[in-house]
Amino acid sequence: MPITELLEANAKKYPNEVSLVEINPDIQEKRRVTWRDYELIESSPMCHYRREITWHVFDEKANRFAQLLISRGIGKGDKVAILLMNCLEWLPIYFGILKTGALAVPLNFRYAPDEIEYCLNLAEVDVLVFGPEFIGRVEEIADKISQNRLLFYVGGDCPSFAEDYDKLTANCASLAPGIPISDEDDAAIYFSSGTTGFPKAILHNHESLMHACKVEQKHHGQTHDDVFLCIPPLYHTGAKMHWFGSLLTGSKAVLLKGVSPKTILETVSNEKCTIVWLLVPWAQDILAALDRGDIKLEDYKLDQWRLMHIGAQPVPPSLIKHWKEYFPHHQYDTNYGLSESIGPGCVHLGVENIHKVGAIGVPGYGWE
């Protein structure tokens, strides 16, 4: 069963329920910054504070982009790269690509122009979808990368060297393209950007993506009533594959574009989040703010928050001990994986093993 069928099933079963929410904290950058200055999560001052879509609209947007790609000759075996900050359009674009039988190629938003060009050529990308944060970088290489390659722009004020995604998809049919897709078909190319040099391409099929959905749900017990708070970038297998648990259960997820302790707790409270994935520095910042009295737990509604998990880096046992002093009822898990192993969960601590915090964990579901 290809992963696109999960989206279509959710659109039929929960058409009017919220699937995705984007929270964009109202942080205005007063000084001029270059693309190199962007933090891990960058707010978009020109966007609305909060946007949401239902499962029906999610699927409809994916279908419209799929129809646009098909109308331009994109189909099975072709590659479509995504160069976007986290936003409400990111996942519908990803699934629109998959619905055509093409391969999605997420790109790290920290790539310099030469790295973008390198990845596009290495993966033999046919289409690049990019957002406003990347106009300068893409323009620098536009003459070279636009030869025999489509450039679609997501956002206002489309640059002259690209085509307007919003205007084009608005005129496309919202019907599913109906392209037959099997579990063995190639689905995505991810780039592993380690310390050994330029990015390396990793190929995954639809069976791998479906396995990632099952791993996440098995490890963290997502139900339809859960609400997942996602802060890290979606181009990374970690963030997207943790969200796959929400996809499998048809539950709501929140994309937060800010990492301050106040912003995180406000979002958990306002959106009724039950599962939050943090990185060590963000958890440390929350605890430090609580210790100083900068924020107070009684100012937020956090009773529904049941699970906090961390991955991607070593977790000091003292951090989780301190965390449990403020959140004694929280479940906790540590997740590790590789882009090659389709994201987190290759090994994990397990929510029942909090007394073993500091250990790398045990083989995850399906990895025994």
Regions found by a protein language model. Name each.
Residues D59-F65, D183, A188, I202-T223, ...:
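Conserved structural elements of the adenylate-forming
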Residues M210-V227, Y235-I275, A289-L290, K296:
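Conserved AMP-binding/adenylation subdomain of ANL enzymes
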Residues N16-V18, A170-F191, F198, G221-V227:
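Conserved pre-ATP/AMP-binding loop-to-beta segment of ANL
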Residues C47, I189-A201, C213, N353:
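Conserved adenylation A10 loop of the ANL superfamily
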Residues N24-R51, I135-D183, A289-G293:
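ANL superfamily adenylate-forming
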Residues E5-L7, S71-R72, K99-K167:
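Structural core segment of the AMP-binding/adenylate-forming
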Residues N16-C87, L91-F95, A112-E117, D166, ...:
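Conserved AMP-binding/adenylate-forming core of the ANL superfamily
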Residues L248, C273-L278, L287-H355, E368:
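Gly/Ser/Thr-rich phosphate-binding loop
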